[in-house]
Amino acid sequence: MKKKILIGIITLLIIIIAVAIGLYVGNSTVRLWTDKYILKKDIGEEDLPTIEIEEKDNIQAYAYSNYLATVGNNTLTIYNSSAKVVTSINVSITKPQFESAGRYLLVADQGGENLYLIYNDSLQWQKQMEGNISHICANDSGAVGVIITGTTYKSVIIMYDITGKEEFKTYLSTTIATDVAISNDSKYLSFVEIKTSGTVIESKVKTISVEKAKTTPRESIIYTYTTNSNSLILKIKYKKQKVVTYCDDGIHIFENGNDEKILTIDNKISFADITLDGYICSIAESEGNSILNSEYELKIQNVENKKESTYIIGSTVKNLYCNNGIIAVSLGNEVEFVNTNGWLAKKFTSIQNIKDITIGEKVAGIIYKNRIEVLTL
């Protein structure tokens, strides 16, 4: 008898849990109520640890992994998720440029010569380049790519390994490189090449075999991609062996010499991004909107299987920020942090205007003129 009662109770609990999950997943009203009152996803500025900054110091901030880094007055300061200083590193940087991958943070003096690679909160190596740094990239293995200008060549592309040892250099005499990315396994480096000498600007993505670049440099470029529509290529990012490519007319996947367009960017799309790990996202006004009721759809697409998730936004979007597996949708004084499943992770509300947002894997920085608030994701 007791066994039957126990089985009945367990069965009832399973049914209740299944119904609750079904309502949460399938009913947006239930999900919003649960997020706010049960899961406590709504956060206010008074709830967050704060880093005080001086507006006159022109402090620049960047979140990576579970840290937040600031650069100002030739000092790189790294904070933890509680806004406590972990370490400070002397640097020579006027205009910081940041890139990150996993636990690695790459910081360069944009237009200058100095480059620094950080792992967690420790300086791995630093270099003074011969030329001006225009673009940088890193991968999860600590490999680094740099585009240099201001030499006898229009662009020089350099790759370094995790120790800072140079892997190879590629020189461009008549064209310029505008972006660079390294595959997860460090076997390939791709770059965007722009030709401006003709009547029409031409853009291509070229993929270099790192092994061939070290042994037979003349044979190192194994793929050259141009879009079918000859659109302008703006940005690239690797997902395994796929080169995810942001163009002015859409987002393409380049792989093994093939071009697949997975998103068309038209006047209906107000924002799009490829910075997420393995996903792309876009924001467009929902169909059937009226003057009194405006909704926007955030669509998140997996670049491997093309599966798509949708998150509904209830007001006008001011800006979009993406990194790792988190999307931040800025609505002015409110920010909705959404994961790649299309679910709300956190909702932040401020009484002041937000200047900027930076997102790491586990933390985000809400940037104001005089302070940075650190939000744990």
What is the predicted role of each segment?
Residues T178-I291, E297-K299:
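Acidic, serine/threonine- and glycine-rich low-complexity intrinsically disordered segments
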Residues F254-T349:
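Intrinsically disordered, low-complexity segments enriched in Gly and acidic/Ser/Thr residues
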Residues M1-T50, E55-K56, L377:
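Sequence/structural signature of beta-propeller modules
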Residues T87-V192, T199:
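Non-cytosolic head/periplasmic domains of membrane-anchored proteins
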Residues I53-Y62, V91-R103, G131-D140, T174-N184, ...:
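Repeated scaffold domains used in trafficking and secretory/extracellular systems
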